[in-house]
Amino acid sequence: FYQFEENRVVEFQALWDLPEVMMQAGAWPMPPSLGREWHVPGPATQDGLVPGPYDEEHGLKSCQLIIDMLTAMKRHPSQGGPEVMEMEKYWHPRMSWYGPSGIGTGRGISGFRNWHQIPFLNAMPDRGQYVDQINYHFFGDRNYVAVTGWPNMIQTLTHDGWMGIAPAGKRVTMRSLDFWRIEKGLI
């Protein structure tokens, strides 16, 4: 993401995918990813570059869908089982979730839950409890939404099972860049 002031870039945010570099170099020190490791393709609709003009109303509507989905997802595990997330309300049943290196790809809601969400929440069940200490910014344009935050997640690593990281009982912060494509009201 780039921040512009007076037609100049004043800030640039990027995540260096060091795990991917380590994998390419054959120096991966952790257990294999739970999901499939491979490149992240462009959007299935092949319309990832959105020409102008900017449609603010559509962009705001798309952002709101993502915010509603994230709000529902944060209900679990503190407010009940997986059903409180209402994932079928927001996610297409055949969606693809492309995680970073070390996590991998999940196909469909069950793939996302099995290969990323369940291990992640088991290891850090206090997800979503420190919203007053995080920052995030949403961007929406037509059917695409992105969010970045530095940090936008704070959790405590209390259990094992996620990327082979030992449960040290330490709070960790995470920076992320997440992108979503919406089709017919579903992610």
Label the model's feature ranges:
Residues 1-187:
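C-terminal and inter-domain tail/linker signature
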